[in-house]
């Protein structure tokens, strides 16, 4: 069974950073790009960026450049996203999703990030 297992919820203070994970199983990790998506309360999904697990190449939504950093660890079939300089606007659910030619065919359950002092 193809699965993406995301790390648990995070409660962080303004100005801090957070790094979440997305562990893939049931398929060859390097064969598919990994996308990251933000779901803010009451708002539509926003594409953050994607990463090619084969070579680590990344592409970012301009809005999230400098905010998000995407990396992978091929040895553990895990993708990571670090968010920096957090503010209340970054409070959201963040999803990883496997990309099949811009069709997101497998999704993680999401990681909830709450930014609060």
From Swiss-Prot:
Any one GO cellular component localisation term in the record: extracellular region
Keywords: Adaptive immunity, Disulfide bond, Glycoprotein, Immunity, Immunoglobulin
Source organism superkingdom: Eukaryota
A GO biological process held by the record: immunoglobulin mediated immune response
Signal peptide location: none
Keyword Disulfide bond among record annotations: yes
Record organism: Mus musculus (Mouse)
Sugar attachment sites: 55
Record's protein name: Ig heavy chain V region MOPC 104E
Matches recorded under CDD domains: IgV_H
Remaining remarks: The sequence of the light chain of this IgM myeloma protein has also been determined.
GO molecular function: antigen binding
Keyword Ubl conjugation attached: no
InterPro entries with a match to the protein in the record: Ig-like_dom (IPR007110), Ig-like_dom_sf (IPR036179), Ig-like_fold (IPR013783), Ig_sub (IPR003599), Ig_V-set (IPR013106), IgHV (IPR050199)
Disulfide bonds: 22-96
Domain Ig-like: 1-116
């Amino acid at each position: 069974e193809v699965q993406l297992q995301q790390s648990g919820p995070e409660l962080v203070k303004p100005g801090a950073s957070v790094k979440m994970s997305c562990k893939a199983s049931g398929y060859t990790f390097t064969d598919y790009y990994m996308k990251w998506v933000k779901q803010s309360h009451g708002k539509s999904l926003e594409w953050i960026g994607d990463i090619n697990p084969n070579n680590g190449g990344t592409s970012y939504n301009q809005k999230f450049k400098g905010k998000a950093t995407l990396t992978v660890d091929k040895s553990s079939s895990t993708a990571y996203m670090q968010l920096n300089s957090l503010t209340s606007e970054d409070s959201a659910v963040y999803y990883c999703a496997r990309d099949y030619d811009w069709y997101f065919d497998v999704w993680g359950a999401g990681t909830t990030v709450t930014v609060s002092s």
